[in-house]
């Protein structure tokens, strides 16, 4: 039976989630995470996608994207296919790395967007990868530190997110 087509349009907001097959790790080391981030830094501008939030955990990752003229499916296909091939060669393994297709949830601008930015960026804290907000500020595999000006990330759109929270 064919899969349902994903709904996408220029300017659509997507909460994208990728998971390792059978709950396995998709990132075993910081080198793995760096390779993935390097791929994002190349593909985000190329596909004219905005990334407002992101978080890499051991066995899954979350992103908040606004599509440009290129569908999110193109970005995700290039990202996940390239990374899975690299990962499989690196660890001398075969087969699927990711559980099914990535999950993509269309989001409304208000009021869900602010909560989603919080949810995605607090994931490492909930997963106990960091213990405090100060540690989260310095956690390099999440967009939170970029928003807190503790690190930089050229492909993360911080100005838009700052605008969402400007009334606080």
Regions found by a protein language model. Give the residues of each.
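Short Pro-Cys-Gly-centered "Cys-loop" motif that presents a nucleophilic cysteine in a tight turn
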Residues: 1-58, 66-168
């Amino acid at each position: 039976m064919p899969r349902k087509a994903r709904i996408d349009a220029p300017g659509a907001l997507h909460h994208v989630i990728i998971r390792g097959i059978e709950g396995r790790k998709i990132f075993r080391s910081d080198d793995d995470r760096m390779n993935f981030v390097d791929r994002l830094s190349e593909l985000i501008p190329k596909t004219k996608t905005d990334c407002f939030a992101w978080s890499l955990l051991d066995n899954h990752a979350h992103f908040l994207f606004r599509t440009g003229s290129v569908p999110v499916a193109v970005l995700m296909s290039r990202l996940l296919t390239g990374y899975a091939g690299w990962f499989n060669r690196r660890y001398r393994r075969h087969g699927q790395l990711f559980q099914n297709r990535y999950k993509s949830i269309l989001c409304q601008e208000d009021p869900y967007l602010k909560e989603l930015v919080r949810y995605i960026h607090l994931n490492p804290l909930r997963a106990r990868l960091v213990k405090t907000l100060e540690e989260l500020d310095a956690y390099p595999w999440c967009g939170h530190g970029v928003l807190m000006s503790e690190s930089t990330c050229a492909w993360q759109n911080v100005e838009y997110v700052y605008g969402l929270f400007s009334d606080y």
